[in-house]
Amino acid sequence: MNKSNSVKRELAKINYRVHTDAIKENIIIPLEISKEKASVVYASEADVLNVAMFGMTAKEWREKNPDKKGNIRDYAEVSQLVCLSNLENLNAYLIDNGVGQQERLIELNKSAIRQMKVFETENLKLTDGVSDTLNNNQVNK
């Protein structure tokens, strides 16, 4: 994975721990789900985010893109990854507050649409060049 993709992936993981902890504390532990079945729950919740952001599950994306290596997030724009990170945090909040998966999907999709409109309207789409500039500035300080 090149530096640009690495930076984009790290950005997408910012709220990952908050998200997975909410799943564990509010779904896995209370329902006494086995370790084997827990991975299915985590994957299902990841797909809630994928559908809210990209309109398809990871499996659907792989089926539509058999020639591409990696996953849907590896090919996302930086602005989409920023939005996805925000959605992870929002989903954790909704899980903590007992909101069901279908209702969360609706709210997450609304939030994704709203955020992406802001990025487009305000011309705030981030580019890899911005990321590289920020990284270079941090190194030079």
Name each model-derived stretch.
Residues 1-141:
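Positively charged, phosphate-engaging catalytic surfaces used for nucleic-acid and nucleotide handling
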